[in-house]
């Protein structure tokens, strides 16, 4: 029963996650906790990370066929994203995350509003033009910066890097929303794999739960990538805005609970 439930839920999660460039952990972790399938939140995180690896692989295959992945920019993002993830996790030992979670959540609320507006990056007037080359493509140095910020946020707050990477690439660097989604999903593969392996050796990864999630998310990711060719870019921005709004409210709520 639980196998089938997680499998079909993962198809839906993978479908949405692949369309907006996130791993899907923001949905899988609360699902596993709600179903009482795990004893701790860390076990839910570790198990969901294993599925996220397969979301990245499946999405990368689909988006590479569409030629939507900016590999040059991704290679600038990836190393600093890994460094940032380590740095973020390291900082949790010294800095209370509750107050910062509230502040970061408020920032995400603002960004979600920008995405929900559905406007083109140029219409928002927030493009960092000095960070673009003569052809309008983002410079690698900005890719490294985006990767670092996304990595630190992921390591410190336990959120997916796509929550930072997609809006940063689309709103501030003018990268096409589908390209931003595809590149984000490609980048999160290696970092999710490292995190999943770490959780496995810590005993936080349940193979029996990760298997149906992975199988479902592989299918969902293919459906999500296919769907991006059937919907408007305004719809994609607004869909991401909804996902981001959910993440922001969830982060603020957890921060408030920690403070109180």
Enumerate the predicted regions with their spans.
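Hydrophobic, membrane-facing alpha-helical anchors
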Residues: 1-6, 49-61, 134-135, 159-168
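Juxtamembrane transmembrane-helix boundary motif
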Residues: 1-16, 29, 33-41, 61-153, ...
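Transmembrane helix boundary and interhelical junction motifs in multipass membrane proteins
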Residues: 20-31, 158-168
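Small-residue hotspots at the loop-to-helix junctions and early N-terminal turns
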Residues: 41-45, 181, 185
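Short hydrophobic/aromatic, small-residue-rich stretches within specific transmembrane helices
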Residues: 48-52, 184-188, 209-214
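Membrane-embedded alpha-helical segments of transport systems
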Residues: 50-58, 83-84, 187-194
């Amino acid at each position: 029963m639980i196998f089938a439930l997680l499998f079909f839920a993962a198809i839906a999660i993978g479908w949405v996650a692949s369309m907006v460039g996130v791993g899907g952990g923001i949905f899988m972790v609360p699902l596993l906790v709600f179903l009482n399938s795990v004893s701790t939140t860390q076990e839910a995180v570790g198990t969901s990370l294993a599925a996220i690896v397969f979301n990245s692989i499946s999405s990368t295959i689909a988006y590479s066929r569409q030629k939507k992945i900016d590999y040059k920019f991704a290679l600038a993002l990836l190393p600093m994203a890994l460094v940032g993830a380590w740095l973020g996790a390291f900082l949790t030992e010294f800095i209370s995350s509750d107050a910062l979670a509230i502040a970061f959540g408020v920032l995400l609320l603002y960004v979600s509003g920008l995405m929900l507006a559905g406007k083109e990056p140029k219409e928002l007037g927030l493009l960092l033009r000095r960070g673009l080359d003569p052809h309008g493509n983002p410079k690698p140095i900005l890719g490294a910066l985006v990767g670092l910020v996304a990595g630190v946020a992921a390591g410190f707050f336990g959120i997916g890097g796509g929550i930072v990477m997609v809006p940063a690439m689309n709103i501030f660097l003018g990268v096409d929303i589908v390209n931003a989604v595809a590149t984000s999903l490609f980048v999160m593969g290696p970092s999710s794999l490292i995190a999943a392996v770490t959780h496995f050796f810590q005993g936080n990864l349940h193979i029996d739960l990760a298997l149906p999630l992975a199988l479902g998310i592989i299918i969902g990711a293919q459906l999500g990538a296919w769907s991006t060719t059937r919907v408007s870019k305004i719809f994609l921005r607004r869909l991401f805005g909804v996902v981001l709004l959910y993440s922001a409210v969830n982060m603020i709520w957890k921060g408030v609970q920690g403070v109180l």
